[in-house]
A protein has these predicted regions:
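Acidic, Ser/Thr/Pro-rich beta/coil linker or hinge segments at domain junctions
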Residues: 263-294
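General beta-strand structural signal in soluble alpha/beta enzymes
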Residues: 23-25, 42-45, 118-122, 160-161, ...
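Small-aliphatic-rich amphipathic alpha-helix that forms the alpha element of a beta-alpha
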Residues: 61-85, 106-114, 184, 201-211
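Glycine-rich anion-binding loops of enzyme active sites
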Residues: 11, 48, 82-168
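Short hydrophobic/aromatic beta-strand micro-patches
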Residues: 138-140, 254-258
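Residue-level signal for inorganic ion chemistry
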Residues: 32, 72, 80, 119, ...
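Active-site-proximal betaalpha loop/short-helix elements
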Residues: 95, 173-249
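Extreme N-terminal cap/leader segments of soluble proteins
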Residues: 1-60, 79, 88, 103, ...
Length: 294
């Protein structure tokens, strides 16, 4: 029966590529990275839990691994930074074997390979509980200042990068983080704030407004609705726009800008009043997206 050290040795073989920034790769107590003196280090962490973010009875382990890495990459996109390295932890149920752990890792690695950065370390344990995974990601600004959520200004336009709603039908596992799109937007110098839509448009817009001390006037008729929201609405008897506003896990970017943008969908304006209203008068904009109960 294979154990932890067999798995670690296998991971070392999977991460054997040479990277000029990695001075000490997986296998030691800590990874050692060389960091450019003129670059910012940007750090984020995210976790996924069986029964909350995925269902291990339904979703393949490689898809689960890909999702936990992509959630972190979506946070990189939200701040327009480039991923540079990651470390991961896996708390594996004792009912799962080393082959399952390998598939989880290969999913994480596949997501990292898309954006050409290494997994440089981590930790694995087994326990009598459901699968839990955590990834900590290290990002770099690479010449572009990070875009935050607290710098929206009255008069800014509000945009999203893609259609929303119904992600639970599958896109919450297969989404592609908008890292490249975020860099393109940031290079324009016109984006004033940004966030990824993980908790739902209504709640994530509220985050921007609260942190920036502003409000918003949305036009519900302009919000792009994904076909999945239409499909889901026939199952839930809710309007597609409700799914677009509140479902979450779309992982599109929600951003504000001081000028018209050729990329994305315009959905409203930032206002001085600290409230969020629907200018079309058709929907309630009370935040109903995801929030963990502590």
């Amino acid at each position: 029966m294979a154990g932890e050290f067999d798995f670690i040795e296998w991971v070392r073989r999977q991460t054997a590529r040479r990277d000029e920034h990695v001075l000490v790769p997986p296998g030691d107590d800590l990874a050692v990275l060389k960091w450019p003196a003129d670059d910012l280090l940007i750090v984020g962490v995210d976790q996924v839990l069986d029964g909350v973010h995925f269902d291990s009875a339904v979703h393949a382990p490689r898809d689960i691994g890909r999702k936990v890495m992509n959630r972190n990459l979506s946070d990189c996109a939200a701040m327009a930074c480039l991923p540079a390295a990651a470390v991961a932890t896996v708390a594996l149920p004792k009912t799962r074997d080393i082959e399952y752990a390998k598939e989880l890792f290969l999913g994480m690695k596949a997501a990292a390979d898309v954006f050409d950065f290494p997994i440089v370390g981590g930790d694995t344990a087994s326990w009598d509980a459901p699968l839990a995974m955590t990834v900590t990601i290290l990002g770099r600004s690479s010449g572009i200042p990070p875009i935050t959520r607290n710098t929206a200004k009255p008069g800014d336009s509000i945009y999203v990068t893609g259609p929303l709603g119904g992600s639970i039908l599958g896109r919450h596992m297969t989404f592609i983080p908008r890292v490249r799109e975020a860099r393109q937007l940031a290079q324009s110098g016109l984006v004033t704030s940004m966030i990824d839509i993980s908790d739902g448009l209504s709640r994530d817009l509220r985050h921007i407004c609260r942190e920036s001390g502003v409000g918003a006037a949305l036009h519900s008729s302009e919000i792009p609705i994904h076909p999945d929201a239409d499909t889901l609405s026939r199952q839930t008897c809710r309007y597609p726009i409700e799914h677009a506003l509140h479902d979450g896990e779309d992982y599109e970017l929600l951003f504000t800008t001081s000028a018209e943008q050729p990329y994305g969908y315009w959905i409203g304006m930032i206002t001085a009043e600290t409230s969020i209203i629907d200018e079309d008068g058709a929907i309630s904009l009370e935040p109903k997206g995801w929030e963990h109960k502590l």
